[in-house]
Regions:
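DNA polymerase sliding clamps and clamp-related checkpoint/processivity subunits
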Residues: 1-19, 26-148, 156-243
Length: 243
């Protein structure tokens, strides 16, 4: 099998994002495209990546499905060598992945494929009471503000306003009205780890808008949609026990 990307920089950025959560993943390649679904070692976060077949200039698949077990740290280092004008060809040869980059010169790398024993995963079918579409730059700023004062922040829907706030000895708060963000929600509140949110919102830099789905003390799903690509993160809530 052989697949080709004319611009591998987006793939490189996504691999770097996923590697912040998990190191070893299975790439699944089938007639629809390329996908990854993985859970971080702490079972707190989940990521799904899908790159549609239409994103590739060449997509020759001999079997119904190919599975590549990959160490993302190794793949990340190789993809960083791609330039702005590079094209990328991925070709499996037995237990290795041949990676060819072409621009002024043709460069070849080989990546050893690994056997990953974990079971195949599916994204859970979650129900949410809140859906917020927000400017990605505003989301990044709000999360970074909260990181200054605490290690967790709350996503709040209150009277059709969306609030991101953190409270400890100090506090931070960003409030967005329905005029600034697209809100489809009832009043609710849930708290999430800033350590993980900071990893997620790095992905928001890839697109202008980010979609947040959540509910009372409920997992968060963050959706990033770019042409021919989907990137989804799920984060468990931080539920504090009552004394």
């Amino acid at each position: 099998m052989q697949i080709k990307l004319e611009n591998p920089l987006l793939l490189s950025k996504v691999v770097e994002l996923i590697s912040n959560l998990v190191i070893e993943v299975k790439f699944k390649i089938d007639s629809s495209g390329m996908s990854v679904i993985a859970i971080d070692p702490a079972n707190v976060a989940m990521v799904r990546f899908f790159l549609a077949k239409n994103a590739f200039s060449q997509f020759d698949l001999e079997a119904k499905q190919e599975i590549w077990g990959v160490n993302l740290e190794d793949l990340k280092k190789i993809l960083r060598r791609a330039g702005i004008k590079s094209s990328l060809i991925l070709k499996r040869e037995e237990n290795r992945l041949n990676i060819e980059m072409s621009d002024k010169i043709k460069r070849n790398f080989t990546l050893n494929l690994i056997d990953i024993k974990s079971e195949d995963k599916e994204m859970p079918n979650l129900e949410f009471s809140a859906k917020v579409e927000i400017n990605s730059a505003d989301l990044i700023d709000a999360v970074e503000d909260c990181a200054v004062v605490a290690d967790a922040c709350s996503f709040v829907i209150e009277n059709n306003n969306f609030i991101i706030e953190a409270k400890s000895l100090n506090s931070a708060r960003s409030e967005f009205s329905g005029d600034e963000v697209n809100i489809q929600a009832e009043n609710c509140k849930s708290k999430y780890s800033i350590e993980y949110l900071n990893k997620f919102v790095k992905g928001s830099k890839l697109c202008d808008k980010t979609i947040l789905n959540f509910a009372n003390d409920h997992p968060l799903r963050m959706d990033l949609n770019i042409e021919n690509m989907e990137l989804n993160f799920i984060l468990a809530p931080r539920v504090e026990s009552e004394d």
